[in-house]
């Protein structure tokens, strides 16, 4: 059976390669070749793995490669079909109306992914003595592009699964569908009875037939994940870890927002699945999109502008249409050097643009006017282009922009910030990860400094030399003076940045301040507090520390 | 380290505005101040909140008495302070990280 599978697999690979070659689609062909090589590498690595954690990483790579190969194959099929249909049939649209306007592409970025878990203190956890651990990761697909997040180890001390990855898709259209799939695998060997007590072990082994049969069926159902049929791309190492699809969802333009949102997850596995995790049923993330029309200039050229309200002063400018603004610079170079434009005209969904007629009477041809409503006022700018062709191309650019804004909707209100994802570090030692919840033990009387301390330590402190003014705080003794008659209101006595611990307030030790209006201040502190001045006659040396109520 | 008393220094400050309380026929702030250029800093039991300016008046080079007077002017109901404290530096670092 295995031999037949191998033969089928080889034939499939051959077919795929041939198809890619025949299409002469070098880009897709190159990507396919790359994935096939990666897949071979992952298979070899998996066979050579001795440790479970390594096997988990290798299996994950294999799963991602398989998904990519299948998706590229699907894309190839589609393109081949389109090519064949194009050659044979006479397209009915040839004599029809011109091609439909298509919206600009954009960059879609998903980040700060967090999946809440819902642990219950049921018998399941109490019986298994050891801490159960799972390895999980997310597979994200947009069009034919597939990307994965890092793998995270989960156990019942985590309240959420939080992924650090930023995943960016570069060529998305406004009708994009971003499919998100959560895969999980047991870190312990599936079906291992090493942790269970002997009585439980005998009980389990006697009923192994039924439960293992169920497990095997469950594994086969999700073998390789993302719907790949085992015949096409079988997983070679049968004894290795197996990832199961735990949940999925699809996000579209409606889910895009410059902020965090929660979306529902469709749960795909049930309790009998060996890798089942108690998912709460939602995923939180930040899904941002930057249409190209917002970040790239869509038109530029020389214009003559009549500033609103002034009849005669036509200024020559270099206009650049970018995002929701038409910037008019004094000179073409200013656009690149970051100089402020002479004039900025807003272009948004409410803007009205008209070509021509307004100034024909004044002998100025090829004009267009842009009107915006600001409250009760309407402000109109009139621009003159150089020629009929120039006017046509400006109008075309503006119509395209209006179309893009209608398609990309909320993404065109303001540019959403997208951080270029840093190249991911290789998988580190798979230590148990705590959630921020466990690290924060915040007491009620805390100072903002405590919170910033914890956050700084978590992010990793920058090794910066402290600024000079901090030296003003380093010369103080740490002890309170119990004889001090007045207390100072804000008081935790920290002399230097301490590792986080409960602050001590001294106001409890001191006598409450007396606010009777006195002209003179309180008596100076007893001189034994200043060992430095004891026995010395240093004249100019201050010897007191006065405190006064104000 | 490099702080020399009496020399100008640049620091991160926080603006604090306090409205005085009425106690009898007096306006008070409700806390005490300690120190001054004429005091011994090594006897300071606390190390928080050094005041740089009070209502525009420079406080970095004042004696204890002068400081007290500036804070207790009968005619002023509101005191605006520029205060520096160590934890401000951590807040700056944190905002630079994010």
From Swiss-Prot, chain B:
Q: Could you say which residues form the signal peptide?
A: none
Protein name, entry field? Tax1-binding protein 3
The major lineage groups are: Eukaryota, Metazoa, Chordata, Craniata, Vertebrata
Subunit organization = Interacts (via its PDZ domain) with GLS2. Interacts (via its PDZ domain) with RTKN (via the C-terminal region); this interaction facilitates Rho-mediated activation of the FOS serum response element (SRE). Interacts (via PDZ domain) with ARHGEF16. Interacts (via PDZ domain) with KCNJ4 (via C-terminus). Competes with LIN7A for KCNJ4 binding. Interacts (via its PDZ domain) with CTNNB1; this interaction inhibits the transcriptional activity of CTNNB1. Interacts with ADGRB2.
Main function: May regulate a number of protein-protein interactions by competing for PDZ domain binding sites. Binds CTNNB1 and may thereby act as an inhibitor of the Wnt signaling pathway. Competes with LIN7A for KCNJ4 binding, and thereby promotes KCNJ4 internalization. May play a role in the Rho signaling pathway.
> Which one of the record's GO molecular function terms can you name?
beta-catenin binding
Mind naming one GO cellular-component term on file for this protein?
A: cytoplasm
> Out of the domains of life, which is the source?
Eukaryota
Q: Which organism is it from?
A: Rattus norvegicus (Rat)
Keywords in UniProt for this one? Acetylation, Cell membrane, Cytoplasm, Membrane, Nucleus, Wnt signaling pathway
- Per the UniProt entry, what is one GO biological process? negative regulation of cell population proliferation
Q: In which tissues is it expressed?
A: Detected in kidney distal convoluted tubules (at protein level).
Quote the InterPro entries the UniProt record gives: PDZ_sf
The segment(s) forming the PDZ domain are 12-87
Q: Where in the cell is it found?
A: Cytoplasm; Nucleus; Cell membrane
Q: Which residues carry this modification: N-acetylserine?
A: 2
Indicate whether Nucleus appears among the record's keywords.
Answer: yes
Topology class, membrane:
Peripheral membrane protein
């Amino acid at each position: 059976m295995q031999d037949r599978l191998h033969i089928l697999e080889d034939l499939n690979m051959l077919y795929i390669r041939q198809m890619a070659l025949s299409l002469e689609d070098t880009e897709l062909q190159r990507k396919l070749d790359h994935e096939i090589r990666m897949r071979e590498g992952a298979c070899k690595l998996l066979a050579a793995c001795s440790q479970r954690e390594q096997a988990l990483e290798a299996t994950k790579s294999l799963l991602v490669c398989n998904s990519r190969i299948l998706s590229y194959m699907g894309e190839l099929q589609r393109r081949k079909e389109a090519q064949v249909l194009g050659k044979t049939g006479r397209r009915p649209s040839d004599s029809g109306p011109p091609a439909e306007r298509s919206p600009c592409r954009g960059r879609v970025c998903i980040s700060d992914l967090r999946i809440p878990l819902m642990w219950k203190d049921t018998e399941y956890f109490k019986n298994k003595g050891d801490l159960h651990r799972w390895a999980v990761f997310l597979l994200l697909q947009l069009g034919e592009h597939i990307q994965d997040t890092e793998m995270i180890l989960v156990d019942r001390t985590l309240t959420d699964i939080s992924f650090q990855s930023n995943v960016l898709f570069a060529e998305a259209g406004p009708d994009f569908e971003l499919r998100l799939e959560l895969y999980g695998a047991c870190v312990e060997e599936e079906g291992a009875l090493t942790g269970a007590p002997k009585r439980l072990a005998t009980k389990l082994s006697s009923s192994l037939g039924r439960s293992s049969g169920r497990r095997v069926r469950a594994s086969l159902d999700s073998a390789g994940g993302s719907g790949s049929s085992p015949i096409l791309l079988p997983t070679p190492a049968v004894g290795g870890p197996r990832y199961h699809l735990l949940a999925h969802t699809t996000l579209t333009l409606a889910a895009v927002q410059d902020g965090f949102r929660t979306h529902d997850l469709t749960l795909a596995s049930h309790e009998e699945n060996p890798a089942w995790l108690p998912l709460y049923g939602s995923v939180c993330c930040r899904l941002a999109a930057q249409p190209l029309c917002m970040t790239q200039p869509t038109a530029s050229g020389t214009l003559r502008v009549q500033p609103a309200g002034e009849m005669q002063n036509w200024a020559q400018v270099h206009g650049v249409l970018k995002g929701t603004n038409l910037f008019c610079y004094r000179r073409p170079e200013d656009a690149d050097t970051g100089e402020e434009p002479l004039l900025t005209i807003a272009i948004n969904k409410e803007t009205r643009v008209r070509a021509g007629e307004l100034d024909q009477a004044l002998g100025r041809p090829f004009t267009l006017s842009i009107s915006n409503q600001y409250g009760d006022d309407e402000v109109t700018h009139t621009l003159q282009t150089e020629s009929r062709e120039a006017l046509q191309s400006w109008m075309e650019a503006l119509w395209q922009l209006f179309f893009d804004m209608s398609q990309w909707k909320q993404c065109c209100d303001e540019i959403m910030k997208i951080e270029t994802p840093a190249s991911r570090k290789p998988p580190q030692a798979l230590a148990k990860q705590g959630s921020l919840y466990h690290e924060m033990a915040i007491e009620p009387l805390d100072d903002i400094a405590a919170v910033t301390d914890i956050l700084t330590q978590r992010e990793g402190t920058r090794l910066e030399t402290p600024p000079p003014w901090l030296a003003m705080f380093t010369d103080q003794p740490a002890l309170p003076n119990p004889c001090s008659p007045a207390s100072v209101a804000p008081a935790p006595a920290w002399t230097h940045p301490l590792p986080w611990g409960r602050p001590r307030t001294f106001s409890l030790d001191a006598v409450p301040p007396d606010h009777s209006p006195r002209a003179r201040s309180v008596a100076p502190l007893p001189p034994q507090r200043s060992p430095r001045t004891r026995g010395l006659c240093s004249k100019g040396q201050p010897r007191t520390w006065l405190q006064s109520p104000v | 380290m490099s702080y020399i008393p009496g020399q100008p220094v640049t620091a991160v400050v926080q603006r604090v505005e306090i409205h005085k309380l009425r106690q009898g026929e007096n306006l008070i702030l409700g806390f005490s101040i300690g120190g001054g250029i004429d005091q011994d800093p090594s006897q300071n039991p606390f190390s928080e909140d050094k005041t740089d300016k009070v209502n525009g008046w420079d406080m970095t080079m004042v004696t204890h008495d002068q400081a007290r007077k500036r804070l207790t002017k009968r005619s002023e109901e509101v005191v605006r302070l520029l205060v520096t404290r160590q934890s401000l530096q951590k807040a700056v670092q944190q905002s630079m990280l994010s």
